Amino acid sequence: MPARESIIWNVNLSIEKREALSRYEPATGKWSAWRAPGDEPRVYAVYVDETDKVWVSEWTAQAMLRFDPKTEKFEAFRSSTGRPNVRQIHGRKGEVWTPESATDKIVVYRY
């Protein structure tokens, strides 16, 4: 995998409900995509932490997803606050911060 500075991560929102996490490598022009787990995933925000794990908010499962690009696996962290509706993800070393627009709370995930 190329150096993290040369990778662009994004989430694809679509009316066809084919939401996916995507990676673009400008040096090669290559796109890769991974469908979020679940029957009808609704991905929204994306954040890459300092260990190169990719965090994605997922509305249908009411969870934060952590994607490992090396194993290409998602890990889900379910919300205990109901429908969190995370629209942004912020972080600092060892933490991911998720402001929940539906609950007016900030949830911190430590790893």
Residue ranges and their predicted role:
Residues 83-111:
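Blade-level signature of beta-propeller repeat domains, shared across WD40, Kelch, NHL, RCC1
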Residues 1-10, 39-53, 82-94:
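Beta-rich, blade/repeat-based domains predominating
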Residues 18, 28, 51, 60-61, ...:
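Surface-exposed loop/turn positions within WD40 beta-propeller blades
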Residues 25-29, 68-72, 110-111:
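Short loop/turn segments that connect beta-strands within beta-propeller blades
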Residues 7-18, 54-59, 98-102:
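Conserved beta-strand positions in repeat-built beta-propeller and related beta-rich domains
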Residues 30-36, 73-78:
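A short beta-strand motif characteristic of beta-propeller blades
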Residues 55-57, 66, 76-78, 89-90, ...:
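Conserved active-site loop/cleft motifs that coordinate metal ions or position small ligands
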Residues 19-23, 62-66, 105-107:
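A short loop-to-beta-strand structural motif that recurs across blades of beta-propeller domains
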